[in-house]
Amino acid sequence: MGIALENVNFIYQEGTPLASAALSDVSLTIEDGSYTALIGHTGSGKSTILQLLNGLLVPSQGSVRVFDTLITSTSKNKDIRQIRKQVGLVFQFAENQIFEETVLKDVAFGPQNFGVSEEDAVKTAREKLALVGIDESLFDRSPFELSGGQMRRVAIAGILAMEPSILVLDEPTAGLDPLGRKELMTLFKKLHQSGMTIVLVTHLMDDVAEYANQVYVMEKGRLVKGGKPSDVFQDVVFMEEVQLGVPKITAFCKRLADRGVSFKRLPIKIEEFKESLNG
């Protein structure tokens, strides 16, 4: 098992008049090698879970297990520091994580910070920059001279240079044009196919259907539904009640079903819809 949350509660500014409960009794598992989506509105607890997975936060109650490391309210930073190498966290606007004077130095910083030699760190940085589609001609440029999309790729390369087993993505395509979004999602798909565990926060149900093999639905700090996307999206009424909706093709087929068209199961992808027509 890759990750397990057991009865996790999290309270921001605990013990103060401003205390605010972000998570209430959340239990979930993320299997090694899976592609898991977390969905829910702003304030539902998704981003808090991501920071718990990476060890940036510790639970107020309950536990988070990442491989062999158990994180509880009493865990110290020195005991969970290694998790940040195993679990790479890409924030919503990842380009804000950039700070070095050149692209290559920025990507090499993380491995060096964990004791990798400069030579090996630079070699890894070159490999990861190539992987995310940054041309070698840009390696010695200031990252702040690049476009927003390029800066985001550099930031992601910096996370990948740490060689994480799990990649945690908080709305990674926010603000990108359709082409840039598609290219990044294709990259994450390839990383998953290579064996990496992916955890994705997104508000795009079509991306959940296309890429994820597991989805958890969060609402007001609680886990309210979970399972395979093909199962979760069958409950169109529930998904509309929580104001998240379903993939476009699923919504279309639900309207057809309401008018008498028969489906064994509502398709969640275009390919499934085509197969249902041919079947």
Curated annotation (Swiss-Prot):
<comment type="subunit">
    <text>Forms a stable energy-coupling factor (ECF) transporter complex composed of 2 membrane-embedded substrate-binding proteins (S component), 2 ATP-binding proteins (A component) and 2 transmembrane proteins (T component).</text>
</comment>
<dbReference type="GO" id="GO:0042626">
    <property type="term" value="F:ATPase-coupled transmembrane transporter activity"/>
</dbReference>
<dbReference type="GO" id="GO:0005524">
    <property type="term" value="F:ATP binding"/>
</dbReference>
<dbReference type="InterPro" id="IPR003593">
    <property type="entry name" value="AAA+_ATPase"/>
</dbReference>
<dbReference type="InterPro" id="IPR015856">
    <property type="entry name" value="ABC_transpr_CbiO/EcfA_su"/>
</dbReference>
<keyword id="KW-1278">Translocase</keyword>
<dbReference type="GO" id="GO:0016887">
    <property type="term" value="F:ATP hydrolysis activity"/>
</dbReference>
<dbReference type="InterPro" id="IPR050095">
    <property type="entry name" value="ECF_ABC_transporter_ATP-bd"/>
</dbReference>
<protein>
    <recommendedName>
        <fullName>Energy-coupling factor transporter ATP-binding protein EcfA2</fullName>
        <ecNumber>7.-.-.-</ecNumber>
    </recommendedName>
</protein>
<keyword id="KW-0547">Nucleotide-binding</keyword>
<keyword id="KW-0067">ATP-binding</keyword>
<feature type="domain" description="ABC transporter">
    <location>
        <begin position="3"/>
        <end position="245"/>
    </location>
</feature>
<dbReference type="InterPro" id="IPR027417">
    <property type="entry name" value="P-loop_NTPase"/>
</dbReference>
<dbReference type="GO" id="GO:0043190">
    <property type="term" value="C:ATP-binding cassette (ABC) transporter complex"/>
</dbReference>
<feature type="binding site">
    <location>
        <begin position="40"/>
        <end position="47"/>
    </location>
    <ligand>
        <name>ATP</name>
    </ligand>
</feature>
<comment type="similarity">
    <text>Belongs to the ABC transporter superfamily. Energy-coupling factor EcfA family.</text>
</comment>
<keyword id="KW-0813">Transport</keyword>
<dbReference type="InterPro" id="IPR003439">
    <property type="entry name" value="ABC_transporter-like_ATP-bd"/>
</dbReference>
<dbReference type="InterPro" id="IPR017871">
    <property type="entry name" value="ABC_transporter-like_CS"/>
</dbReference>
<keyword id="KW-0472">Membrane</keyword>
<dbReference type="InterPro" id="IPR030946">
    <property type="entry name" value="EcfA2"/>
</dbReference>
<dbReference type="Pfam" id="PF00005">
    <property type="entry name" value="ABC_tran"/>
</dbReference>
<keyword id="KW-1003">Cell membrane</keyword>
<comment type="function">
    <text>ATP-binding (A) component of a common energy-coupling factor (ECF) ABC-transporter complex. Unlike classic ABC transporters this ECF transporter provides the energy necessary to transport a number of different substrates.</text>
</comment>
